[in-house]
């Protein structure tokens, strides 16, 4: 019977007992053959960067490190079954720190999520998983201790002047510089005309744009910006507002199960074309979170338990949608797996970077994603939208993201923990709200910091 096969490329890094935690089998790249007839063969070329085999050292270097030693590069039929392998030898340790950043980064990664580690014993490979019993034991208490309780931000205890700086200078608004948004088509990100364009915006226009970005972005007459529409979701372009029927596609798990990048791009192109025909410019998808358990409430919106597989499929979907002028909100950024709100997620720096952020990272760097939907999760004791290290340091400074960050669905009170003041101060741009209430509006819109 004719069929296609998958070329799965894995690496096994050198491991030092008690050193940087590492998996023995790591997917690094993959490809799909053409349709092959019985007995037919094909030569498939797969490439990847050596730096992609670096591991994150959260304890010592606080950076990605490619440790010296032998790296077994293998073609596998699955994560355990090696078909053939070769060895790559690193002659010395390479620490991607400071000016010696990874080629894919704008700035070198370093520890920024230490507050999310919590008081948890993390499973270690050291001495053949000697701490397994301790790491997997039920916690002695389910209560959140200090200092986390006092630092836990909810709308009920959040001071909306927290991020205001009275030394900030009021920027120019309402200027008549004669520019329109259309004039900036294909302009460089650092083009000085952007500042002149921003000077034309009025406070009311900005406040409305920020507060009411649920399934839309508002028109802004001062710069000739038209209103746009954004639609859900990962398996279909929903017809919430158009009344026009759409097509439902297989869920992301099925798309990822094909291991076919071309198909993922074609899927994104279909979503882009349907969006274009329905008058939508933004797509609330693809979902990029990690399958941690088969019982994850929103697994159907996400690709895989493997970040490399998920990231590559997501990147191709983003590319496909962009072909039709549609921007994709990769979601839910980050460390989110279900419908629960206000749930604190605790994890260490290495796991956050190597597992949970990996799909988003690949979608930004390789797919050129320029829109993000922020999760309902708390990273440690703060909502992800109030985590500047996530939204600014990692997303924008390290990965070079250039685009818009949107909250998840807001409701009329931000579910009790989301508010525009905390969001704007930490890298979120607009609120996914269809109800004009207190929390989705900036509390002090005339303050220089807010403007």
Where are these regions (language model features)?
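Short beta-strand elements
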Residues: 81-104
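Glycoside hydrolase catalytic-domain context in secreted enzymes
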Residues: 1-58, 65-75, 79, 103-451
């Amino acid at each position: 019977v004719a069929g296609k096969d998958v070329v799965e490329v894995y690496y096994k890094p050198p491991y030092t007992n008690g050193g940087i935690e590492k998996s023995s089998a790591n997917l690094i790249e993959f490809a799909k053959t053409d349709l092959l007839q019985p007995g037919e063969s094909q030569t498939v070329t797969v490439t990847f960067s050596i730096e992609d085999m670096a591991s994150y050292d959260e304890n010592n270097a606080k950076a990605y490190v490619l440790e010296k030693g032998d790296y077994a590069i293998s073609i596998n039929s699955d994560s355990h079954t090696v078909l053939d392998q070769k060895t790559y030898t690193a002659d010395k340790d390479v620490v991607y720190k400071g000016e010696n950043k990874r080629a894919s980064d704008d700035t070198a990664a370093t520890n920024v999520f230490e507050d999310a580690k919590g008081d948890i014993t993390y499973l270690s490979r050291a001495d053949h998983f000697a701490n397994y019993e301790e790491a997997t034991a039920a916690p002695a208490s389910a209560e959140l201790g200090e200092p986390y309780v006092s630092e836990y931000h909810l709308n009920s205890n959040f001071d909306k002047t927290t991020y205001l700086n009275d030394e900030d200078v009021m920027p120019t608004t309402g200027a008549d510089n004669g520019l329109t948004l259309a004039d900036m088509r294909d302009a460089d990100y650092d083009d000085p005309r952007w500042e002149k364009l921003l000077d034309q915006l009025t406070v009311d226009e900005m406040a409305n744009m920020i507060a009411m970005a649920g399934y839309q972005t508002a028109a802004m007459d001062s710069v000739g910006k038209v209103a746009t529409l954004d639609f859900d979701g990962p398996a279909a372009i929903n017809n919430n507002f158009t009344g026009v029927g759409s097509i439902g596609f297989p869920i992301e798990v099925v798309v990822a199960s094909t291991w076919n990048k071309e198909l993922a791009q074609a899927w994104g192109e279909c979503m882009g074309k349907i969006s274009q025909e329905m008058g939508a410019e933004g797509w609330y998808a693809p979902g990029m979170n990690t399958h941690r358990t088969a019982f994850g409430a929103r697994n159907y919106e996400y690709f895989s338990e493997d970040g490399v597989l998920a990231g590559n499929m997501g990147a191709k979907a983003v590319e496909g949608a962009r072909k039709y002028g549609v921007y994709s909100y990769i979601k839910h950024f980050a460390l989110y797996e279900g419908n629960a709100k206000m749930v604190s997620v605790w994890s260490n720096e290495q796991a956050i970077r190597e597992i949970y952020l990996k799909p988003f990272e690949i979608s930004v760097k390789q797919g050129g994603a320029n829109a993000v939907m922020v999760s309902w999760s708390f990273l440690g004791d703060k909502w992800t939208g109030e985590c500047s290290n996530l939204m600014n340091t990692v997303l924008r400074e390290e990965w070079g993201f250039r685009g818009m960050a949107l909250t998840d669905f807001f409701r009329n009170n931000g579910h009790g923990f989301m508010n525009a003041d905390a969001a704007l101060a930490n890298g979120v741009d607009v609120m996914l709200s269809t109800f004009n209430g207190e929390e989705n509006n900036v509390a002090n819109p005339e303050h220089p910091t807010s403007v």
